[in-house]
Amino acid sequence: MYQKMNKPYWLLKKIGEQLEHIKNKNIQAYSRFNLYCEDESRIGLLTMNHKALTIKGVKPLCRYQNKFDNVYLFGAFSPINGSHLLLEMPHCNTDNFQVFVDELAEMDRQEFKIVLLDNGAFHKAKRLVVPPNIALLFLPPCSPELNPAEKVWWVIKRELKNKFFTNMDDLAQAITNATKKLNNQSIRQLTAYQYCTNAFWTIFND
């Protein structure tokens, strides 16, 4: 499933130029390159109301709670082959992002990972140490619609809507059940936005 992006062609050109620079800089050390889209999403005990099917004339009812305990999901998803990493973190900050990029780097040390992500302050923190087999490629400011990872969060949260979780353990189990339904094929289908896959294959076509 490919998504058509209504953005100027300069974006595709800019990303292509950055990808070419990354390839030229690292081609001697790495023979395999992959593209990932990275993002974070907060999920908590606050009930997420959504539409529901009922008998005609019957108003849908949903047990609701107004609690704000939450966790953060850190995710990186490849629109090229569907490879992905998901980690649950207590906070969204530089320390936890460091843990995540280190785990992503270890997932395959022989693969050079180009990570497409937003301009969050902790993504650019001076004390962040980017592993040698990872390059961060930043999207234009205020453009979440350009990040394919948003589609993955939508699928996961869809499984949690209209659900009542008594505690964080129940929520964690529900998140686990939702993420187990994802696989490489579904990740690739969700995240294969043309603007980034076309740019990648234009540069890494050999």
Spans of model-derived segments:
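Acidic/histidine-rich, metal-coordinating catalytic segments
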Residues: 111-123, 147
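Short beta-strand segments
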Residues: 37-38, 114-117, 137-140
